């Protein structure tokens, strides 16, 4: 399991296994990636990725007004930086 931050400050936890396509767990507003801990434990034998959305948990917030597009761009940047080609 790898934890880290992207260049723009997104905190993530990546459990890379032989199964090449990770399951991505995205929490809601007001929560953190830790809300998914039971599911992450259940899927520990599979590749999975969880992260804190902008301004939540250990992820930074780079601007005051955040849109849904910003959350989408955050995920795209994360999977690009981790060189993930496909996700569930």
PLM features: what roles do these ranges have?
Residues 49-88:
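Active-site loop/oxyanion-hole signature of alpha/beta-hydrolase fold enzymes
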Residues 1-23, 44-47, 77-80, 84-86:
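Alpha/beta-hydrolase fold catalytic core
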Residues 10-11, 34, 65-68:
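Short, charge-rich amphipathic segments
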Residues 14-60:
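Conserved HGGG/HGGXW glycine-rich cap/lid loop of the alpha/beta-hydrolase fold
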């Amino acid at each position: 399991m790898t934890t880290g931050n992207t260049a723009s400050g997104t905190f993530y936890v990546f459990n890379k296994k032989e199964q090449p396509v990770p399951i991505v767990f995205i929490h809601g507003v007001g929560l953190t990636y830790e809300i998914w801990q039971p599911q992450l434990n259940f899927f520990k034998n599979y590749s999975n990725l969880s992260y804190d959305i902008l301004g939540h948990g250990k992820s930074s917030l780079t601007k005051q007004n955040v849109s849904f597009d910003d959350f989408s761009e955050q995920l795209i940047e994360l999977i690009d930086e981790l060189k993930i080609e496909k996700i569930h």
